[in-house]
Design a protein with these regions (language model features):
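RecB-family 4Fe-4S metal-dependent nuclease core
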Residues: 1-200
């Protein structure tokens, strides 16, 4: 509908103006969109496409993940230090440039930039992690989690994580790994394994 389209255009325009202001205040001199990032980890090669990779006049890099909505969800990911997609992009850029970049989420429908610190973006809404850990430590937790899960798979054990399944010793992550997270069932590719209900 015309009104919906007009509203969408207005919010998108405001979001782009705000992002341009953030970029200007940060002294950004280079912006790359849909930037390919490639690297490796103990399991093999990793590759992805970061929404925005920026560099300021001091040569510091930042990777920004653009989201249409989620002004509560994504700050919470930073608070819980569970921004894994950003952490993976950051590690791949670290492998390329030799230093950890800053990370941030930009939520378009609210024109809000969230970051765990203001190192690159001085006007960002800073959301530090509750436990004091940073993106580099999240990456190390991911590696510990990967090693734990690989050892389970190699021994023929595949965990289905559901709220309705009691926690056991085998389903408890090691202390240096990421805590187990129950994902939204709407995005579960393995619902057939997890079971279903007849809603008719």
């Amino acid at each position: 509908r015309g009104a919906d389209l007009a509203g969408f255009r207005y919010r998108l325009h405001q979001a782009m103006r705000n992002l341009r202001d953030q970029v200007g205040k940060a002294g950004i001199v280079e912006v790359q969109s849909e930037r390919a990032v490639v690297g490796h980890f103990p399991g093999g090669e990793l590759a992805g496409s970061a929404d925005l990779v920026m560099k300021n006049a001091r040569g510091e890099h930042a990777v920004v993940d653009m989201k249409w909505s989620g002004s509560k969800k994504f700050p919470q990911k930073l608070r819980d230090n569970r921004h894994l997609q950003l952490a993976i992009y950051a590690e791949l850029l670290r492998q390329e440039h030799g230093a950890w970049p800053s990370v941030a989420y930009y939520v378009l429908d609210r024109a809000r930039l969230f970051a765990p610190d203001d190192r690159v973006f001085p006007s960002a809404e800073v959301v530090p992690s509750a436990d004091g850990e940073n993106t580099a430590q999240l990456w190390q937790r991911f590696l510990a989690t990967w090693r734990w899960r690989v050892s389970q798979v190699q021994s023929g054990r595949f965990e289905v994580v559901l709220d309705s399944i009691p926690v056991t010793d085998e389903s408890t992550a090691p202390e240096d790994a990421m805590g187990t997270e129950t994902l939204n069932e709407a995005y579960n590719d393995y619902r057939t394994l997890a079971g279903w209900e007849n809603r008719a």
